[in-house]
Amino acid sequence: MTLAARPKVPEADKWQLSPQLLQPSYLGMIAGGSVFRILEEKDMTMRGLVHKYFDTIHNYMPIMSKVKLNKQIQEVEGLNSKSAFMVLILAILLLTEHPPADFDGALGSSELYQVCKYHFSLFLSLKEPSIELIQAGLCITLYEYVHGIPERAYVTIGTCARMVSVLRLHSNANSAPQSALTEDYFDENAHVISAMHLLNR
């Protein structure tokens, strides 16, 4: 996606002062604006970010299908993305960044952490649960544990568990044949549930 093709946030200044003007349909554009601003500041591309994730975090917490993630990036480039995917990209950015030297985990002073939690909370409040939102929550949970804020991690992982229940991912994962556990959606379900149990210990 070119810089000129970035989504514009409708009436951003107005809804910040009057939250009742914020429509659920705006959330993808708002999160997308944050994603592209941060990527530009870091001189990164979305594909480069995802490659970094699969070279690092994915080796220890495999919760995403590379095939599906690349397909979703193509949808973003074609201006046809699911809005929750932008929150997932923010969470991947958060998990793969080097924290600033003055970062104080107890105060949540990382700007990217605050931005990521802000969009995650908005989606939880105004949008339906989705596998992308659960994956974002798991990334945030891992970040919170690693940076010494376990109380927040406990709340975040609890939220993920409830979304898993709403989406009935347990039954979907349990019904997947072994031959299907290779880069498909059932594979994601099973790995998401595994990661959730691991982080909830």
Model-derived segments and spans:
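Tryptophan-centered motif/residue detector
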Residues: 15, 60, 193-194
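Short, compositionally biased low-complexity segments
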Residues: 13-30, 163-171
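C-terminal transcriptional activation/regulatory domains of eukaryotic transcription factors
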Residues: 26-132, 137-149, 181-184
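Intrinsically disordered, low-complexity transactivation/modulatory regions
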Residues: 1-10
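Acidic/serine-rich, low-complexity amphipathic helices located in mid- to C-terminal regulatory regions
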Residues: 144-201
